[in-house]
């Protein structure tokens, strides 16, 4: 099966270099996508190295299944199931590096039939795995103004969330909103456009997508699981594309690289004390894209790469 997707990985060299790949190490690509990062890791692995890749998207899984390499294994699953997967593969505490390239992939955004794009018309779906969950169209139809407004405000940081929610429900009372351009045009007519370079529906589409796919919950669960999966000295490298993702990643890294403060006189066992005062992570770096990369790949503009390491 041939798959053609136009995809330029963001900060690919920086991400791969951050892993400090060991030839016979074990690595996990938590967001396979079109395989750009996985293929780079495989190039650096020796004969006894191993790479496991995960992606919830069936098309990404199909692309990965075409890689015929005994060192490589891919599963069609949410990355929140990383810990279960690692247990099944008996690699808990043995992994040298884990990468995440968060957000929507080119597989989803480039194919109008997936319903992610506010620029090209398609069915209003937005599910990263179309076989599970409720579509964006169904959710908007079934939800009330308060629920829609909450999602737009909290997951899209949309200032006009309530105004947009009212407009969506007014249209829904006439007919269900079933296409991406229909939704985009409702939003465009509802709120003022100050920046001609940024589509007024951008934040709302982001918010609905994040909610439909439970992205923030998935990220949080996956991040916590890395602490058990990685070996001492193992690295976690994460590229995020908007402030909600980056805030979550930053908070996770700071929390696990800072010793807890125990109130004086608080009764606590020695085991609990060791657990509370031992840092699990060491923050290595925060990298932003170069201006040259942003010029060549505008999607890189909002990206942030954060790197941390399990304490030896």
From Swiss-Prot:
User: What does this protein's UniProt record list under function?
Assistant: Specifically methylates the N4 position of cytidine in position 1402 (C1402) of 16S rRNA.
Highest taxon, organism lineage: Bacteria
Gene3D superfamilies (UniProt xref): Putative methyltransferase TM0872, insert domain, Vaccinia Virus protein VP39
One Pfam family recorded for the sequence? Methyltransf_5
* Protein name per the record: Ribosomal RNA small subunit methyltransferase H
Which reactions fall under this protein's catalytic activity?
A: cytidine(1402) in 16S rRNA + S-adenosyl-L-methionine = N(4)-methylcytidine(1402) in 16S rRNA + S-adenosyl-L-homocysteine + H(+)
Q: What family is this?
A: Belongs to the methyltransferase superfamily. RsmH family.
Q: Where in the cell is it found?
A: Cytoplasm
InterPro entries from the UniProt entry = RsmH, SAM-dep_MeTrfase_MraW_recog, SAM-dependent_MTases_sf
Q: Name one GO biological process term.
A: rRNA base methylation
